[in-house]
Amino acid sequence: MKDKLELVPVSLKEANEFVRRYHRHHKPVTGHKFSVAAAVNGEIVGVAIVGRPVSRYLDDGWTLEVNRLCTDGTRNACSFLYSACWRCAKNMGYKKLITYILKEENGASLKASGWKCIGEAGGERWTGKRRPEVDLYPAQMKLKFEIE
């Protein structure tokens, strides 16, 4: 089949460049445990960047977080990447993988790949000393999803 999605390795630099070009509301990340890409006919159509959980309370050594997932809109690329991320994390010995989406998003690709919605998470904005002067991301509640 000519237009089949394929999993391909990708460097953090390449994944971040894809995020810079295509992500609706996030910027590239500074580090990762691994990144993967989805390709069709050798052309990258989506990337996922997986790292340690942003929340230090969830950073237990057994949990990773999909920090960025971004596609060009290719059908089924999101669920393909979420499934691939879980297979990779599980094969590395991790017990849980988490991610967050905006509350306005429906999570269909996560549900299609076996993830469960845990509920609302976080606040609308950053708080504390690290809060940027200008909001870097949409001021909305997030939904937390996980798979184990």
Predicted feature descriptions by range:
Residues 140-148:
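Charged phosphate-binding loop/patch that engages nucleotide di/tri-phosphates or the phosphate backbone
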Residues 4, 63, 142:
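A residue-level signal for beta-strand positions that form part of recognition/binding surfaces
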Residues 46-47:
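Short glycine-/small-residue motifs
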Residues 1-29:
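Short amphipathic alpha-helix that is part of the acyltransferase structural core
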Residues 9, 33, 39-40, 51-139:
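Acyl-donor binding region in acyl/amide transferases
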